[in-house]
């Protein structure tokens, strides 16, 4: 008997509902041509949830996510809700509590530049002519974003603010094991990012990563300081495979890697907990300026679905087929507006149709 999977679908705001429709096309192909038993159920989140329920993360949505095997998210936010108090705005009032509720300790941000699209990168052609494939593994629950004490003080004419960078050994061990396992499934290379020449937390980070590495003798481990890796990624991104980062450094590096691909509309992301339950979403925003114009790139949403199938369902072969369908579509010259050199481009729904068609052929 085949396992039945349940996905909580959160289309959200902006272009989210549009690109989610294209992910549905891929799901339908998986049902009809690959005999996968996948059920989906939609729930409101973000701005649309505020409009419909008066709250960005309704209890019904949270319960729906709890009863699923994974969460597939579109996008959240828009100008319509920017006048709300900051803690009530869609992004902060929905994503942060959702991540906290499920204890997502790891963020995966792949940055792939396909050689067919190397003209999009701001880097020189001789650097990116073969494309690149980097996976940033970012620790999500520790570090300076959550460390205490933190605050701001004014004493007479003196004003200052302070934050605390703190990492517990178990947090580093947990994220390091995951990064090594991912490196083992790729090119067996892992680069750990720190600032161990200055920060005590980074000294511990490096010591613990070295300790964990003894369990993965087949993975080549290297260490770089955050300032150096920022330069090295620009100089030669192909030298890297998996990057292991703390919360702050991963925030910086993942955005740099995204920028040098030339189109964030191509990039998926995943947030995972210890049970491999995950939240999968495009790395870009809700893009309200192009909402409803049928020109958004659905590839990031489709690749987010691929990551869901890979990490939460453990169906690597199926995920590879989705990835290959995207690659083959690009090789054939099909492009959406954001990645096209000219006016000859596909609409959002057309790109979804083409990718679904290529996937059918790879049965």
Swiss-Prot record:
It catalyses: (2R,3S)-3-isopropylmalate + NAD(+) = 4-methyl-2-oxopentanoate + CO2 + NADH. Its cofactor is Mg(2+); Mn(2+). One of its GO terms (biological process) is L-leucine biosynthetic process. Mg(2+) binds at residues 227, 251, 255. Pfam families: Iso_dh. GO terms for molecular function: 3-isopropylmalate dehydrogenase activity; magnesium ion binding; NAD binding. GO terms for cellular component: cytosol. It is found in: Cytoplasm. Homodimer. This is 3-isopropylmalate dehydrogenase. It comes from Buchnera aphidicola subsp. Diuraphis noxia. The lineage of its organism: Bacteria, Pseudomonadati, Pseudomonadota, Gammaproteobacteria, Enterobacterales.
